[in-house]
From Swiss-Prot:
Annotated region described as Alpha helix 1, given as residue ranges: 9-19
Location of the region described as Beta-strand 1 in the Swiss-Prot/TrEMBL record: 23-31
Gene: gvpA
Region of interest (Alpha helix 2), ranges: 48-67
Spans annotated as Beta-strand 2: 35-43
Domain notes: Experimental and modeling studies suggest an alpha-helix beta-sheet beta-sheet alpha-helix structure; the protein is insoluble in all media tested. It is thought the beta-strands form the hydrophobic interior surface, while the alpha-helices form the exterior. Extensive mutagenesis shows that many mutations leading to loss of gas vesicles are probably on the exterior of the gas vesicle.
Annotated stretches, region: Binds to GvpF1: 1-22, 2-43
Signals that turn on the gene: Expressed as a probable monocistronic transcript in mid-log phase. Expressed more highly than the gvpA2 (c-vac) transcript at mid-log phase. Maximally transcribed in late log phase. In 'wild-type' cells (probably NRC-1/NRL) gas vesicles are seen at all stages of growth; in standing cultures, cells float. In this study gvpA2 (c-vac) was not detectably transcribed, while gvpA1 (p-vac) was transcribed at high levels during log growth and decreased in stationary phase. Presumably most to all gas vesicles are derived from this p-vac locus.
Annotated protein name in UniProt: Gas vesicle protein A1
Impact reported for A27E: Decreased interaction with GvpF1. No gas vesicles
Species in which this protein is naturally found: Halobacterium salinarum (strain ATCC 700922 / JCM 11081 / NRC-1) (Halobacterium halobium)
Subcellular location: Gas vesicle shell
Amino acid sequence: MAQPDSSGLAEVLDRVLDKGVVVDVWARVSLVGIEILTVEARVVAASVDTFLHYAEEIAKIEQAELTAGAEAAPEA
């Protein structure tokens, strides 16, 4: 059997840390129409620099959503 190529694994790990991987999970379990479990998770695997850039972009998106929601709300 051939040994796994450690340089290939190192390259994959380097790319994952450089680019980052985000796994976004949403699941709901219901029994007879009654929700018994909801799972929401976001897992990020990245270098600190990549994660900070990702967090900044997510904050911009959330701020834009809040601004759009405030503009759409009718004034009293």
